Amino acid sequence: MTKGILGRKIGMTQIFAENGDLIPVTVIHATPNVVLQKKTIENDGYEAIQLGFEDISEKRANKPQIGHAAKANTAPKRFIREIRGANINEYEVGQEVKVDIFSEGDIVDVTGISKGKGFQGAIKRHGQSRGPMAHGSRYHRRPGSMGAIAPNRVFKTKNLPGRMGGERVTIQNLKIVKVDPERNLLLIKGNVPGPRKGLVIVKSAVKAKAKAK
């Protein structure tokens, strides 16, 4: 069954394995989440648990938010997300979910909002090749052909310059190197989406058949 927790990306560092290998890791600070609601097939058409992360003052919350959190005997939350595929029988409303639901060696998927890059060209945004850099070249970094003459228009799928980043991105099959329940930290091998202090969702990997090497 799926396990999941909400946290914030602290940044990257490196640790040494027992055999001396240097491992680059991303540190995620996941303070205890609170189960705000259990979604059931009878009431909602699907099964999921709703987690809340980071308290906010009641002054900054509206009445529906305050009432929803009160059912779980907790304060209103800044971030609320659902974890589908979880065994809802293992959870109760108001229960805390901590980093110790994971263990070293677990394979997870991490979802976050990618860093915003602003307005970028087709080469940086889509990875296109540039044109010839010779003096007589007609273009260097332009998008290139807009398409054939016959349609008499540019198709929506044409890769063009525009805003880059700020999108929901999931990196799959990352390995948890270390779990620190005392400090509510997860150390995950490799990089995860988003800037420092960005919200991330750590869930059991969907496609992992075996533990990553």
Curated annotation (Swiss-Prot):
Region (Disordered): 122-147
Disulfide pairings: none
Protein known as: Large ribosomal subunit protein uL3
Protein family according to the UniProt entry: Belongs to the universal ribosomal protein uL3 family.
A GO biological process held by the record: translation
Function: One of the primary rRNA binding proteins, it binds directly near the 3'-end of the 23S rRNA, where it nucleates assembly of the 50S subunit.
PROSITE patterns xrefs: RIBOSOMAL_L3
Keywords: Ribonucleoprotein, Ribosomal protein, RNA-binding, rRNA-binding
Ribosomal protein keyword on record: yes
Subunit structure: Part of the 50S ribosomal subunit. Forms a cluster with proteins L14 and L19.
InterPro entries: Ribosomal_uL3, Ribosomal_uL3_bac/org-type, Ribosomal_uL3_CS, Transl_B-barrel_sf
Keyword RNA-binding part of the UniProt annotation: yes
Pfam families membership: Ribosomal_L3
GO cellular component: cytosolic large ribosomal subunit
GO molecular function: rRNA binding; structural constituent of ribosome
Gene coding for it: rplC
